[in-house]
């Protein structure tokens, strides 16, 4: 599927590289085919500046503004459209926030996270296994259940019962034969 997030005034963009990396702004004006004017009045570091199109990722969200509007108008339009709140709920924003939090975390916090992940995996596996015993859903349990069902059908014939009895008798006879050899 082709991305249709075209560059236009009012389009929300994320800065890819540089000192403003992963910050969000709005295209206020298009300078030329390679550069745009970007601003975010609610972010102190995102004052109105020129950005290369190679350095911005257009997002699907838009703000209804005219080209080269004032900061006041842009701030009001962003507040009424609630674009920053909508962006904060997107998967990419959540991923970036998690990445930033992990990078800023201390050694001990990363250790705690590893321990918590291990614990969560252990308990979820334990609960899954308990439920799998009651009502099999994993492929190996289902396959085992099918094999046992087919074995019951085969074992119910008189010839199969005879073979099973013969095998049981042979198994019982083996230990006694071993004892006799050890006595001699």
UniProtKB/Swiss-Prot annotation:
One matching Pfam family: KOW
Any one Gene Ontology BP term: ribosomal large subunit biogenesis
Domain of life, source organism: Eukaryota
Cellular component GO terms held in the UniProt record: cytosolic large ribosomal subunit
Ranges annotated as biased composition (Basic residues): 160-174
UniProt xrefs under InterPro entries: KOW, Rib_uL2_dom2, Ribosomal_eL14, Ribosomal_eL14_dom, Ribosomal_eL14_KOW, Translation_prot_SH3-like_sf
GO molecular function ontology, one term from the record: structural constituent of ribosome
Keyword terms, alphabetized: Ribonucleoprotein, Ribosomal protein
Chain positions covered by the region annotation Disordered: 149-184
Keyword Flavoprotein in record: no
Family the UniProt entry places it in: Belongs to the eukaryotic ribosomal protein eL14 family.
Name of the molecule in the record: Large ribosomal subunit protein eL14
Protein species of origin: Trypanosoma congolense
